[in-house]
Structures are given as C-alpha cells and as structure tokens.
A protein has these predicted regions:
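Short, low-complexity N-terminal intrinsically disordered segments enriched in polar/charged residues
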Residues: 1-37, 41-42, 46
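A beta-strand edge to alpha-helix "cap/lid" segment located at domain peripheries
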Residues: 2-12, 77-158
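General secondary-structure edge motif
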Residues: 11, 23-24, 48, 52, ...
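Short, charged/polar micro-motifs that form catalytic or ligand-binding hotspots
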Residues: 34, 58, 118, 122
C-alpha cells in the first residue's frame, strides 16, 4: 500500500484553512473579552465591518458598526451588569475564500446590579450563528446572531 505525498499547494491550502479558523477563533475570543470588559464599545466595534449586523433574540437588531457600538455604549451606561463571563464553545467554522460562517454554543453567567437589593446571578444558554469576511488579511464579523434558548436566575449556595 502506498500513500501519495500531498503537493506543496495542497499543504499550503490546508495550512491556510487552519490559520483562517484560528484567526476566527481569536476574533470570537476578543468579542467575548470585549463583552466581559463591561461591553466596551471601542473593543467591540473594532471587530465588526462598517456594514455589519448584530442581532440577538429578545434584544433587537443593529445594522452598521455605529449602531452596534451605540447599543453596547447604551448597555454599558445602564450599569445593570456588574460582571459577566461569555463562554463560546464547540465552534463549527466553514471557510470559503475570504468569507466564512460559524456556529458556536453559548453559556453566559452574569451578575446584575439590582437597585433595591443584593446583586442577582443569571445564566444564559444559547447559540451564535455568524458570518465573517476577510479584508486585507483581517477577519471581522459581517453578521452575528445570538439565539437565547434559556435565561434564568440562579442562586449561589452558602
């Protein structure tokens, strides 16, 4: 039994695909970090193309980088979220030239400030469906949709 040695161009294409997938994973990690940095609009805005769309079930749809950063600025200004932890996992990323799609599972824990009482703890379970576009070697979000499947309070045990 003999196995064919892949050509250099085949190996280069395979390597490029892996590099693209890793770049998109890093993009998603920066998105989660920006959300967990009190929804920092400057950090988050840099991850989206000018004509991108951000949408989440139960929240709304924001078209264009300015609208997206405006939403995150408004959310930050409420002071409602004390801290959060966005965990995006189990990615399925498909690359096609300078575009790609991604599907991620989401587990988010956050602490909400409550005006008349102790902070409350919540969890969100859901998923993301995303489209990415590479321009001048850099991957950014073209669209991000988050579907919340469950949003519930939880209690810490003493």
């Amino acid at each position: 039994m003999t196995t064919a040695t892949p050509s250099v161009s085949t190996l280069e294409a395979r390597l490029q695909r892996l590099e693209d997938i890793e770049s998109i994973r890093q993009l998603k990690a920066r998105y989660c970090a920006g959300c967990d940095a009190d929804h920092d609009p400057a950090l988050l805005g840099a991850l989206f193309h000018d004509d991108a769309v951000w949408e989440a079930s139960g929240i709304g749809r924001f078209a264009g980088r300015d609208a997206i950063t405006g939403y995150f600025s408004a959310l930050r200004a409420t002071g409602r979220i004390r801290n959060s932890e966005h965990c995006a996992m189990n990615p399925i990323i498909d690359i096609s030239g300078d575009t790609a799609t991604g599907h991620w599972r989401l587990l988010m824990l956050y602490t909400a400030n409550v005006p008349d009482g102790a902070p409350q703890f919540f969890r969100i379970i859901g998923w993301y469906r995303e489209q990415y576009r590479r321009v001048e070697g850099e991957w950014r979000f073209q669209s991000l949709f988050c579907q919340v499947e469950e949003h519930a309070a939880y209690r810490l045990q003493d």
